[in-house]
Regions:
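C-terminal structural segments of small proteins and small subunits
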Residues: 43-72
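Aromatic-residue detector
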Residues: 5, 11-12, 35-41, 51
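Polyanion-binding surface elements
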Residues: 1-19
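Compositionally biased terminal segments of proteins
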Residues: 5, 30-36, 65-72
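Residue-level detection of beta-strand scaffold positions
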Residues: 13, 26-28, 60
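A short, structured beta-strand/loop element
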Residues: 17-46
């Protein structure tokens, strides 16, 4: 069962990402220590698409590496 977009957004918020905004239901999440922003589109109760889950996982992994001081 796919996760909900609200769960992905909560994960990003907990990790220190901030919502830069967007048009409609699109949101761009960024963190000063992560090179790329994460774009999520949809309502909080919608099922997350596999590419959205992957983008969040990659961003959180990159943040973890940056906090440990490991280069990508």
């Amino acid at each position: 069962m796919p996760r909900k977009l609200g769960e992905l957004r909560a994960d990003l918020r907990r990790a220190g990402f901030r919502n830069r905004g967007g048009k409609g239901d699109h949101q761009n999440w960024e963190h000063p220590r992560v090179a790329k922003s994460v774009g999520l589109a949809g309502q909080n109760g919608d099922d997350a698409q596999p590419y959205q889950e992957r983008a969040v996982r990659v961003a959180l992994d990159e943040l973890a590496r940056a906090q440990k001081g490991v280069e990508p």
